[in-house]
């Protein structure tokens, strides 16, 4: 396939990249959740701590406060200490989860921006598609930017149109 033939299919290339990026953006929360589960193994420890607290609370309910005050108070302090430890653990895990999601989102958007910039760079002077100039007469210079080809659709306009169309098509799935 020659360069001229490849340039004829540029509209499909850009459309597929935009579609792929939008699909990935929809799947980003699920991917972030999966990655956080893979990277964090603390959920088992938290469930074990919750089970211990529940067991101590059941034991506390069987102890008579009037007859065995020392044991009751000791058990209550132990429950409070374990609960505080669990809360601290959950806060740390939640902060780490937010950090993981943020890093994944930033990496995705940087990758998407780099992809779009590379497409704009490659097709800067070549029209992505050529249509009869009558179809776009009032806006032909704007639509053709930066190619300056009569009836041509420039890469920037094509990316904007593709983003809008793909967003409308994928809206029910998000």
Swiss-Prot record:
Keywords: Coiled coil, Endoplasmic reticulum, Membrane, Transmembrane, Transmembrane helix
A biological process from GO: tail-anchored membrane protein insertion into ER membrane
Keyword Cell division assigned: no
Chief location: endoplasmic reticulum
Coiled coil feature spans: 39-94
Membrane topology qualifier: Multi-pass membrane protein
Region (Interaction with GET3/TRC40): 39-97
InterPro entries: Get1, Helix_hairpin_bin_sf
Domain of life: Eukaryota
Record's GO cellular component terms: endoplasmic reticulum membrane; GET complex
Entry-linked Pfam families: CHD5
GO MF assignments: protein-membrane adaptor activity
Endoplasmic reticulum listed as a keyword: yes
TM annotation in the entry: 9-29, 100-120, 149-169
All ranges on the Cytoplasmic side of the membrane: 30-99, 170-174
Segments on the Lumenal side according to the record's topology features: 1-8, 121-148
Location within or outside the cell: Endoplasmic reticulum membrane
Entry's family note: Belongs to the WRB/GET1 family.
PANTHER family found in the cross-reference section: GUIDED ENTRY OF TAIL-ANCHORED PROTEINS FACTOR 1, TAIL-ANCHORED PROTEIN INSERTION RECEPTOR WRB
Biological role: Required for the post-translational delivery of tail-anchored (TA) proteins to the endoplasmic reticulum. Together with CAMLG/GET2, acts as a membrane receptor for soluble GET3/TRC40, which recognizes and selectively binds the transmembrane domain of TA proteins in the cytosol. Required to ensure correct topology and ER insertion of CAMLG.
Assembly, per entry: Component of the Golgi to ER traffic (GET) complex, which is composed of GET1/WRB, CAMLG/GET2 and GET3. Within the complex, GET1 and CAMLG form a heterotetramer which is stabilized by phosphatidylinositol binding and which binds to the GET3 homodimer. Interacts with CAMLG (via C-terminus). GET3 shows a higher affinity for CAMLG than for GET1.
Name of the molecule in the record: Guided entry of tail-anchored proteins factor 1
